[in-house]
């Protein structure tokens, strides 16, 4: 399977609007039993999440996984920091890239791959407001061109 393929459970569509994605990395997530059940039920929010590297380990911060309904006392804190499973070489590469100005790690999507929950992390640089407007303008122009081509080819 190619990188990022699998049953997509959650996507962070706002991330591609707010950031220039330089590169992507697939990482596993350390979850408790009730958390993986909630993730498989697609009860996960990536909107405010980000990843950081501390003491040679990668961590996923501010990602909300809703408590499992039948979890009772086994439910963990929905906003807890979760460890990401990456190779040491990938962590050092990302740590070196993060030293650049304005770089951050953003979760792009969560999906299941061979029964395991994976997160696609993007190394990103923040966009300015004029970049966002330019992206919207370019997307609208492409949509208009496709509409005109479709109308022209229908004749």
UniProtKB/Swiss-Prot annotation:
Gene Ontology terms: cellular component: cytosol
Keywords of this entry: Cytoplasm, RNA-binding
UniProt subcellular location: Cytoplasm
Membrane spanning residue stretches: none
Gene3D superfamilies: 2.40.280.10
Function recorded in the entry: Required for rescue of stalled ribosomes mediated by trans-translation. Binds to transfer-messenger RNA (tmRNA), required for stable association of tmRNA with ribosomes. tmRNA and SmpB together mimic tRNA shape, replacing the anticodon stem-loop with SmpB. tmRNA is encoded by the ssrA gene; the 2 termini fold to resemble tRNA(Ala) and it encodes a 'tag peptide', a short internal open reading frame. During trans-translation Ala-aminoacylated tmRNA acts like a tRNA, entering the A-site of stalled ribosomes, displacing the stalled mRNA.
HAMAP family hit by this protein: SmpB
Protein name, as recorded: SsrA-binding protein
Organism, scientific name: Streptococcus pyogenes serotype M4 (strain MGAS10750)
């Amino acid at each position: 399977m190619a990188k990022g393929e699998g049953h997509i459970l959650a996507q962070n569509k706002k991330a591609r609007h707010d950031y220039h994605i330089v590169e992507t990395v697939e990482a596993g997530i350390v979850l408790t039993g009730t958390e993986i059940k909630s993730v498989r039920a697609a009860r996960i929010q990536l909107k405010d999440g980000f990843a950081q590297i501390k003491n040679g380990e990668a961590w996923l911060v501010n990602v909300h996984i809703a408590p499992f309904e039948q979890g009772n006392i086994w439910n963990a804190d929905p906003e807890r920091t979760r460890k990401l499973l990456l190779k040491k070489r990938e962590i050092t590469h990302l740590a070196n890239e993060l030293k650049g100005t304005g770089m951050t790690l953003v979760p792009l999507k969560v999906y299941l791959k061979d029964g395991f929950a994976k997160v696609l992390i993007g190394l990103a640089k923040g966009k300015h407001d004029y970049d966002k407007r330019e992206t919207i303008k370019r997307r609208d122009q492409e949509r208009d061109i496709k509409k005109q081509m479709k109308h022209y080819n229908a004749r």
